[in-house]
Amino acid sequence: LPEEYRGNFRCNDEELNRIWEVGAYTMHLTTREFFIDGIKRDRWVWSGDAIQSYLMNYYLFFDNESVKRTIWLLRGKDPVTSHSNTIMDYTFYWFLSVYDYYMYSGDRHFVNQLYPRMQTMMDYVLGRTNKNGMVEGMTGDWVFVDWADGYLDKKGELSFEQILFCRSLETMALCAELVGDANGKQKYEKLAAALKAKLEPAFWNNQKQAFVHNCVNGQQSDAVTRYANMFSVFFQYLNEDKQQAIKQSVLLNDSILKITTPYMRFYELEALCALGEQDAVMKEMKAYWGGMLKEGATSFWEKYNPEETGTQHLAMYGRPYGKSLCHAWGASPIYLLGKYYLGVKPVKEGYKEFAIAPVLGGLKWMEGTVPTPNGNIHVYMNSKTMKVKATEGKGYLTIKSRRPPKANIGTPEKVSEGVW
């Protein structure tokens, strides 16, 4: 589709500039009537791929119409007879994408239109819970999680799936409130709270200082994977001490099964950014996406394992040339740089209020534009100066500085030690 590149990013690091440009090109190639997964092989709409496309879109095109078309397409018609794309986790991403869209766009009318289909989709999910109120793979379900280079057990109750399920119930409660469904709000809040209360007793392992991967017949497995742990961090489902424990025992621990898809690197690096590790994430972005560029990539791939060489990079699904070399989920630096380096995100729907918390992450300077429903937010930052310009809404700027900063407009207020 013809798209206007409303968002942009530039910095002193030319490799990172190239990563942003190739990410934007990858997104554009995979934007048609809908946000599709890859431009050559599947050309299909998958909910897990799509939610990342939406989030990247909010920092690049701000194309709301393509978001709405894709969300409607993925839902389909009633009665519900399977999960979204038959994949359990993809159903949960579908719920989450609706409220994300509302927060960025402010479009309540769309939520009102979609809410009855959200209810019937959630009824389908609730009808497939076990005696613990949790979800397990049933006949006809694809429990996906990720394309992993190691063994991922899909048996029993996966901690990752329960966390997504819990967030989906919370999302249903928020959407129920938006449409004035008081009974629905109460119902979904109660279900979400009950499930959330079970997460730590069921899956947290004090010895491993992490969520275990799954429970089978009420028994924790020995396996720890990154998935549930990183989602629990940026969903803020754990206290600060446990989040910091996860950072060391899982996210920065090379002995834990590594993620080799940009799909899940998206969430892994988001969790690290949420924990203030932008310097480390910058190195990872340059190594991982820069690694693809060094292999000759002109768009970003479905999967990249730096340990592979030559034509191994082209193989997937048991086929020597099976890999998609232009895959939307490969473009996640667009989102990470907009939200966690320029530091821009909506606080109230449609950017009526927004937060700006820029972090250089090892750069000397950076600047960029983040689109909003009726304008833009422009951010420039170096080690001594910050400039922010917004065309709409009320903004809250947060910076870290040992000394009180000087402002041309307004008076900085101290939030905590070194934070203004």
Task: Describe these PLM feature segments.
Residues L16, Y58-I71, Y102-M122, T129-N130, ...:
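Structural helix-adjacent loops and short alpha-helical linkers that scaffold large soluble proteins
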Residues K77-Y93, L126-A193, A197-R265, L269:
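The feature captures the catalytic groove of carbohydrate-active enzymes
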Residues L1-G127, N132, E136-T139, Q248, ...:
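Substrate-binding groove/exosite segments of carbohydrate-active enzymes
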